[in-house]
A protein has these predicted regions:
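N-terminal Lys/Arg-rich, disordered targeting/topogenic segments
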Residues: 1-8
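Conserved functional hotspot residues at active sites or interaction interfaces
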Residues: 9-72, 129-168, 233-292, 346-394, ...
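Hydrophobic alpha-helical membrane segments, chiefly transmembrane helices and signal peptide h-regions
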Residues: 14-34, 222, 230-233, 299-301, ...
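Short acidic, flexible loop segments centered on an aromatic residue
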Residues: 48, 169-189, 226-227, 281-309, ...
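Extracytoplasmic/periplasmic/luminal assembly and interaction segments
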Residues: 66-108
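Intrinsically disordered, low-complexity Pro/Gly/Ser/Thr-rich segments with frequent PxxP/GP/PP motifs
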Residues: 93-107, 188-217, 308-334, 403-427, ...
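Hydrophobic, ordered structural segments
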Residues: 104-139, 168, 172-174, 199-249, ...
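Long, internal scaffold/assembly segments composed of regular secondary structure
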Residues: 249-341
Length: 467
């Protein structure tokens, strides 16, 4: 392809909430490089390139899943049970909701949230909650609505008898996504056919049972990577203890491997009572760790509450195997867990609570990335909602939570945790949150659940281009 001094070729690559514009003017750039400018004779002329505003998209987890149809047949296909409630927020004018199509393996009817582009690229956020009681599928599950990405760490799940873990792979893009699953358990890396080259068609979701790759694994971690289209990955775990429902929840993606991890919001509610009865070994609260490197990690787990109380637990995590650190004798409350490690780790937490009818519910709580100075979020309606802020930085922070004309300012001291009751189903704008990590917990008669508050999506800004 050729250019002339007066011709300009523009290529615009559109993506989720970002846009990149590349401008080439061959003759003009060559001349400027040779003669400079009047104001700076020795400096090549530059050009400011402004990205084209793009729509913002996030994908929610969808509804609860069962590996059968309504009649209990076809255990190779996932079918939905009930409907999740979704709350949304945007800095734009509106949020459009649509669904991704199910594949041959079924689907959770995930919601695609789209904030159309305006004069600038908007932000969009959301979360979902579902309380379900259908046969042996009972409990509360919550999840964040997430940006598509090429890498997701799912810290949670089990394939022991009575435990069903389903990975959902949602592709909101217009190209095929080729997905690889790196699966780890307490023995190390799971080597099984079918974990690589999983094709997820554009604008569809594929459901992948974890038991298809590994059986009788008490503790699992899954690293989901994709090429081509980007993916939003979640994991649903359901538990049946003999014949008694043992809970349901959704594992949201956690923070990437790091020597410092924060699980900002964990709910503990009568965990000792949840461990009574048969087949209850996995009802105890734990922090799950995985070291993806080659060296053992010395880990310190800091456990704190908003009233300033807390404890420290020391552990060792061997490389390449999943480690569960038991948390015994902690009173009921809303906690934050801070993990410091000598090697990069990923982390998540699980707790269990009694529910009506002698059942239990489990909750999985993901680690989270630090927020920027301003973030929007929306919390799906549910019982016993709290918003947790954790300040892992060395400086105190003044955080403002605004909903419409209402606002509240909180002092979050360095190293401290603050818990706040908040309105649900309304847009919340969080400011002053640079370096803060935040999460949401639910605690009620239906069980416990939670999700991390996601940072604002990175948006391209104007750049100065020189030859």
């Amino acid at each position: 392809m050729s250019t002339t001094p007066s011709s300009v070729r523009r290529w615009v690559v559109r993506g989720t909430a970002t846009a990149v514009a590349v401008v080439v003017a061959a003759g003009a750039v060559t001349a400027a490089h040779a003669i400079g400018t009047d104001s700076d004779p020795g400096r090549p002329a530059g050009r400011t390139v402004t990205p084209v505003p793009a729509a913002a998209e996030r994908v929610c987890a969808g509804s609860a899943l069962r590996l059968s149809d309504d009649a209990g047949n076809d255990a190779t296909q996932a079918s939905t049970v009930g409907t999740a409630t979704v709350a949304t927020a945007t800095t734009g004018s509106t949020v459009e909701r649509s669904s991704l199509d199910a594949s041959t393996t079924g689907g959770s009817d995930p919601r695609l949230l789209t904030a159309p582009a305006g004069e600038t690229t908007p932000q969009v956020a959301g979360s979902s909650l579902q309380s379900v009681s259908s046969g042996d599928l009972v409990g509360a599950g919550a999840a964040s609505c997430d940006d598509p990405t090429q890498s997701t760490w799912l810290v949670g799940g089990s394939t022991e008898t009575g435990r069903t873990s389903l990975i959902t792979l949602s592709n909101p893009t217009d190209v095929n996504a080729t997905v690889d699953l790196a699966i780890f358990d307490g023995s190390g890396t799971v080597n099984a056919p079918g974990t690589t080259g999983i094709v997820v068609a554009p604008n569809t979701q594929k459901v992948v049972p974890l038991s298809g790759f590994v059986s009788d694994a008490a503790s699992t971690v899954v690293h989901v990577t994709s090429s081509g289209g980007q993916i939003v990955a979640h994991m649903q775990e359901t538990v049946v203890r003999t014949l008694t429902p043992g809970g349901y929840d959704i594992v949201s993606g956690g923070a990437a491997p790091s020597r410092a991890q924060v699980i900002p919001a964990v709910a503990l509610a009568d965990a000792q009572a949840a461990q009574r009865g048969d087949d209850a070994a996995d009802a105890a609260p734990i922090v799950r760790l995985f070291v993806p490197g080659t060296k053992s990690a010395r880990v310190t787990l800091g456990i704190s509450t908003a009233d300033g109380s807390g404890a420290t637990v020391n552990a060792t995590a061997e490389p390449g195997v999943v480690t569960d650190v038991a948390l015994d004798d902690f009173p009921d409350g809303r906690y934050s867990f801070t993990v410091t490690s000598t090697e990069p780790v990923v982390a998540g937490a699980r707790s269990t609570t009694p529910t009506e009818g002698n059942g239990t519910d489990l909750g999985w709580f993901a680690s989270a990335e630090p927020l920027g100075d301003e973030t929007i979020t929306a919390i799906a309606p549910g019982e016993g909602v709290r918003l947790n802020f954790v300040n892992p930085t060395r400086e105190d922070r003044s955080v403002t939570v605004r909903s419409g004309d209402e606002r509240r300012t909180l002092k979050v001291l360095s190293g401290a945790t603050v818990t706040l009751p908040v309105q649900t189903a309304k847009q919340l704008t969080l400011t002053g949150t640079e370096g803060i990590v935040a999460g949401v917990t639910y605690r009620g008669a239906d069980g416990i659940a939670g999700f991390p508050v996601r940072p604002a999506t990175d948006v391209s800004t104007p750049v100065r281009v020189y030859p």
